[in-house]
UniProtKB/Swiss-Prot annotation:
Family membership: Belongs to the glycosyltransferase 83 family.
Protein name: Undecaprenyl phosphate-alpha-4-amino-4-deoxy-L-arabinose arabinosyl transferase 1
Keyword Glycosyltransferase: yes
EC number(s) reported in the record: 2.4.2.43
Transmembrane segments: 4-24, 87-107, 115-135, 136-156, 178-198, 207-227, 257-277, 295-315, 316-336, 355-375, 383-403, 411-431
Pfam family, one: PMT
An example Gene Ontology biological process: lipid A biosynthetic process
Enzyme class: transferase
A single Gene Ontology CC term: plasma membrane
Gene: arnT1
Biological role: Catalyzes the transfer of the L-Ara4N moiety of the glycolipid undecaprenyl phosphate-alpha-L-Ara4N to lipid A. The modified arabinose is attached to lipid A and is required for resistance to polymyxin and cationic antimicrobial peptides.
InterPro entries for this protein: ArnT_tfrase, Glyco_trans_39/83, LipidA_mod_glycosyltrf_83
Molecular function GO labels: 4-amino-4-deoxy-L-arabinose transferase activity; mannosyltransferase activity
Natural source organism: Sodalis glossinidius (strain morsitans)
Amino acid sequence: MERGAGLWLGLLAVFFVLTYLVPLEGRLLWQPDETRYAEISREMLASGDWMVPHLLGLRYFEKPLAGYWMNNIGQWLFGSTNFAVRFASVFSTGLSALLVFTVSWTVGRQLRQSLLAALIFLSLLLVFGVGTYSVLDPMIALWLNAAMAAHVFALRADRRTTRGVAWLLLGLACGLGFMTKGFLALVVPAIAVLPVALYYRQLKATLGYGALAALLAVLVNLPWALALSRLEPDFWHYFFWVEHIQRFAAENAQHRAPFWFYLPVLALGSLPWLGLLPGAMAAGWRARRVQPERFLLLCWVVMPLLFFSVAKGKLLTYILPCMAPLALLLAAYGRECADKLRSKVFDANAGINTAFALCAIVALLLAGSGLLPWARIYSVGEWPRIVIGTLVFAGWLCFAAVSRRSQGDRWALAAFCPLLLSLLVGQIIPQRIIDGNQPQEFIRRYETTLNQSRYVLSNHVGVATALAWELERNDVLMYDDKGELAYGLEYADVQGRHLSRDDFPHWLAKERLKGDVALLLLLDRRQDLPPGLPKADKVHRNHRIALLHYQQLPCCEQ
């Protein structure tokens, strides 16, 4: 084993455990994303139907099946826990780190360098932020990272058979990616591969091997696609036109954002390595003739970034697949700078981390001091959260200082800057944000009342899925707003699962004769209860969330 490699292997393992595993159970689930995916898998396991996704008992056609299956396995192994909900994301991120290690080892045959590349990947702010959060992006990123690795193997292959196997692996990865999140898994590899083929004049061969990969991707998806089409003929219409065309290209696309949206996301997501980012990208371009693998990695960063920037709909999680090739570029550039004793690069990176941590500390103090009333998000009694936040970013400052020099591998200790943030972020979040965005705590406080209610309703899909998850029931009704369940509510066999404001008083007068009714509302900040609601027997409110409890009436009061 190379000198120092054992130390970095141990540090990598400790970092993964502390950052990706230890905090999972202690953090409350966020709505709408985490509660949505938790409840979909809970309903799949409860019903035994792994083919047709349902949310609150309604058809839910926004994504294919593989991501749900991975989440199902997490809950099957670890039960109805927050750890189980997030396990698939962490597992996928861990496998992506293994792919980063494998690619680095394949290219350079340097064990220490490969371990550092994996550590850099796991420490990127965007990676550990999304990788410990229950969404499908870490899973699609895993398959796209596998496709990227297969592309590296194909580029380095010196025999036709080896190259063909690599392209088949790329096709398999794309097929599994399509099963996870759809056509994105086909588009991203295609646009990343194209400039490499053009620059190295391999277009004809690439098209041939690409056709082979595409055929395998189709064969991987054909069985479940046909089976789901037979069970739910409307799935492909909704999934293709609504989820892909409208989300990415239509004028009314979801999550619209300007073209430059991903530039600040990439900058912040690259912390604590932002100081190395420009040099790493430039080095990837300069090395295109002597190190084609680095140019390939550059294409896997830049081309998807451009594609997502052009798309009308944008979310910060979309560029997660760019981070594995970026980590490889950062590791290679960092090693070059360390070998050449170019300490100014590491000084700059440490300076950026220092400035970021100081700004975060100042922002925390301002948010709790009341000096800026419009920016105050902490109440008077929440000073312990501010103290914890200050300690978190003080830790960021300490590791930034340690990483300032290129001596040995000290520069790589910048990876530990976000360690305390990952461990303690749940203790920093203000209560008003917890109540509106992490309703588990509020629901558990009134769990007895909710469990005793014959009917439970909510005006927000995220809160409704949190109710369903905590109470283990899929019959939560929607009040007023339909949200992302609008399509599923159109089916004739689920009529009565949504109540408008006008219909609710009449429905309540009838149904509370059969049992208690609980209505959980998510309100805007400083919003009063909506007008026109029948008077509740009990009202429990905390910031943006309110529970209205209507007790059962005896039949004689009809």
